[in-house]
Amino acid sequence: MLKVTIIGVDLAKNVFQLHGATADGKVVFRKKLTRPLFERFMAGHHPCTVAMEASAGAHHWARKFTRYGYQVRLIAPHYVKPFLKRQKNDAADAEAIVEAALRPTMR
């Protein structure tokens, strides 16, 4: 079984899209979760790196994930956009966030 080392999260009002990957970028899971399920999933998952686009709600989640033991990376949206491979949707955004976060030179 592949070990998840990074989770890309596309934040939205009601539904969150998650993209879990290994350190070399292999996809382990793609999930779409509601707010309560998202919190429960993250509380029960082993701590790893969580990457999100920096937005108003991202700071709230970053504080919460830090308390759970996760390492959090907030990435500016204009650094994520070049990594989109297909039409913009929540799943593609979560994947692009992981791609951007895996880059060694990403701020």
Q: What positions do the PLM features span?
A:
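Phosphate- and other anionic-substrate recognition elements at nucleic-acid/protein interfaces
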Residues: 1-107
